[in-house]
Design a protein with these regions (language model features):
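Glycoside hydrolase catalytic-domain context in secreted enzymes
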Residues: 1-343
């Protein structure tokens, strides 16, 4: 429904397919972005493997094969796809273990072949860049670490990808073209590059951007920040809140005295060895001035009619600890759901 809402142009409520109000939708991540080993993150070297211990690889494809590739509206299927960083471990019959963006099986045989996808395929960001260390947030060239940057571009093109996400340097692409000429001849190289050019340009033609790439400021001002749209969005958010339990009919509450306990906010590690946000601290999880519009605030549990407690899941890192490695371990640690230290 979301993809159809983006891509289709509607006239008097009728889906007319591609048109001037269409937005190209890029879906991600093929063939899935969830089953990283140990719950780790494939943005890092330590999370580069996707594993399927229950042999559920095909189940993960259903969001694509029965969803975004099988739209009921006039556009038919999502017009662009982004593969994920992971190495889909044990899936390629040839035994090759490379990131999905490099895989001739995942992209060529499955996506392009079995599922006949001929839209734009764009790599995830930075897959051709070098990776400095296991914990580094830089390049994500999984399975191709020993190859040159040019060879990485060449392999991605061989897999059937059209666009390099996060790459602003044309030099390695031009060098990859030369490699294609050496292996398949000038005509073969032109055919391959023109194939991607057609896929990329087609979306501009479909949406009318090739003929008119400009936006009417008057129309834009009517759409952006439109009060009716904002109201509809807010109401949709309210409806998305699901009450799991209401033991003893605790809700709804009339105006009463409520206690809001503070919550602990740890300092969060970020990319490039940096930290995100302020130092670790205790603070209220909501704006108390806003809450005073609806409740009388209690200064302690004893004087409150009830409490509203905001709980956040424990955070113990992304499953890799540099300090563990420095102490002689391998760095790989469980992602614990305990609030206390993992033992």
């Amino acid at each position: 429904s979301v993809v159809e809402g983006y891509q289709s142009t509607f006239v008097d409520g009728e889906d007319t397919g591609w048109g001037s109000e269409s937005i190209v939708a890029m879906i991600k991540h093929w063939p899935s972005g969830g089953p990283e080993e140990g719950g780790r993150d494939a943005h890092f070297n330590y999370g580069k493997y996707a594993v399927y211990p229950g042999n559920n690889f095909k189940t993960h494809l259903k969001a694509f094969t029965e969803g975004a590739f099988a739209l009921q509206g006039g556009t038919g299927r999502a017009s662009a796809v982004m593969p994920y960083y992971t190495i889909s471990h044990g899936i390629d019959p040839s035994g090759k273990e490379v990131g999905n963006n490099y895989s001739e099986y995942i992209i060529g045989d499955l996506l392009r072949g079995k599922y006949t996808y001929d839209g734009v395929v764009c790599t995830d960001w930075g897959v051709t860049h070098n990776n400095a260390a296991v914990e580094s947030f830089d390049g994500k060239c999984w399975g191709m670490e020993q190859e040159s940057i040019v060879r990485r571009h060449y392999q991605i093109l061989k897999a059937g990808v059209d666009q390099f996400g996060g790459n602003n340097d044309k030099a390695p692409i031009l060098e990859a073209y030369k490699l294609w000429v050496a292996d398949y001849g000038e005509e073969g190289a032109r055919q391959r590059f023109e194939q991607s050019a057609v896929r990329l340009l087609l979306n501009s033609f479909r949406t009318g951007l090739f003929e008119n790439a400009y936006t009417d400021p008057a129309v834009a001002s009517e759409v952006v920040g439109n009060p009716e749209f904002m109201k509809a969005g807010y109401e949709a958010q309210l409806k998305s809140v699901v009450m799991v339990k209401n033991l003893g009919n605790a809700l709804p509450q009339k105006r009463a005295k409520v206690w809001f306990p503070k919550r602990f906010y740890p300092q969060t590690p970020g990319p490039f060895g940096l930290t995100m946000g302020p130092e670790a601290h205790w603070d209220y999880p909501v704006d108390l001035q806003l809450m005073e519009k609806y409740y009388d605030l209690a200064s302690s549990p004893a004087e409150a009619d009830f409490a509203l407690v905001f709980i956040k899941e424990p955070f113990h890192g992304e499953g890799y600890d540099v300090n563990d490695r420095k102490k002689g371990g391998n760095g790989y640690v469980p992602i614990s759901l305990q609030y206390r230290p993992y033992k």
